[in-house]
Regions:
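Short acidic, glycine/proline-enriched helix-loop-strand junctions
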Residues: 62-67, 108-111, 155, 160
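Catalytic cores of alpha/beta
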Residues: 76-86, 119-127, 144, 150, ...
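Glycine-rich beta-to-alpha transition loops that act as phosphate-gripper elements at the mouths
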Residues: 22-24, 50, 71-77, 93-96, ...
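Conserved beta-strand positions in the central sheet of alpha/beta enzyme cores
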Residues: 20, 45, 70, 92, ...
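Conserved functional loop/turn residues at catalytic and ligand-binding sites
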Residues: 40, 87, 95, 108, ...
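Glycine/Thr-rich beta-alpha phosphate-binding loop at enzyme active sites
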Residues: 41-46, 84-89, 105-107, 117-145, ...
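Glycine-rich phosphate-binding active-site loops on the catalytic face of alpha/beta enzymes
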Residues: 90-103, 134-142, 174-197
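Conserved N-terminal beta1-alpha1 strand-loop-helix module at the mouth
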Residues: 1-89, 106, 165-166, 185-206
Length: 206
């Protein structure tokens, strides 16, 4: 049996998709996540900026033990511990917080840590991040990510923001480990259909 940490990391890098759910209410977050799961999404990040987000993490983790439910915007070790206690199977942070990463590693929970510059990316990797979230991608761009990966190909990057079926092939061609997708799925009229389409495009482009 593979360790749970490796199972989660494999789920992210095999499907190459992390759904980022950042919505105004807990009920919206739960409903969108549930419909995205119906569409085939296997890794779902519920951001802690949503009031009641921890309850959503716990509910989804309980109802969908086969899905990798993560907590996003985890800024410190306390939030990390609370998220893990609620059932989060991976943690996402917009910045490098060594105490948070250390606690996650103690409990063998994968971390996706935010960075933008090459120095920040290396710092995140040296701190023990399993994946490095390139953020904000709108400011950096796909060409820049490809340039960064040239000397840092050994560090698995996950760009977040602005992903659509029209541009994912460019990200994958740049060599990223996975892609964080948000509004294309979370704000769709038919969440499950958009999730299926996005995953299909990713699978064909991989």
């Amino acid at each position: 049996m593979k360790p749970a940490k490796l199972v989660t990391l494999n789920a992210i890098t095999d499907t190459k998709v992390v759904l980022i759910v950042r919505l105004p209410t807990a009920e919206q977050s739960y409903d969108v996540a549930r419909r995205a799961i119906e569409g085939g999404v296997r890794a779902v990040e519920i951001t802690l900026t949503t009031p009641g987000a921890m309850g959503v993490v716990e509910r989804l983790a309980t109802e969908h033990p086969e899905i990798h439910i993560g907590a996003g915007t985890v800024l410190d070790a306390h939030a990390a511990y609370t998220s893990i206690s609620a059932g989060a199977r991976f943690l996402v942070s917009p910045q490098v917080n060594t105490e948070m990463i250390r606690l996650a590693n103690r409990y063998q929970v994968p971390t996706v840590v935010g960075a933008m510059t090459p120095t920040e990316i290396v710092t995140a990797a040296e701190a023990g991040a399993d994946l490095v979230k390139v953020f904000p991608t709108e400011a950096m761009g796909r060409a820049a990510v490809k340039s960064v990966l040239a000397p840092l190909a050994h560090i698995p990057l996950v760009p977040a923001g602005g992903a659509t079926p029209d541009n994912v092939h460019e990200w994958l061609a740049a060599g990223v480990a996975a892609i964080g997708v948000g509004s294309y799925i979370t704000k769709a009229d038919d969440v499950a259909a958009n999730a299926r389409h996005f995953l299909d495009v990713i699978a064909r482009a991989s």
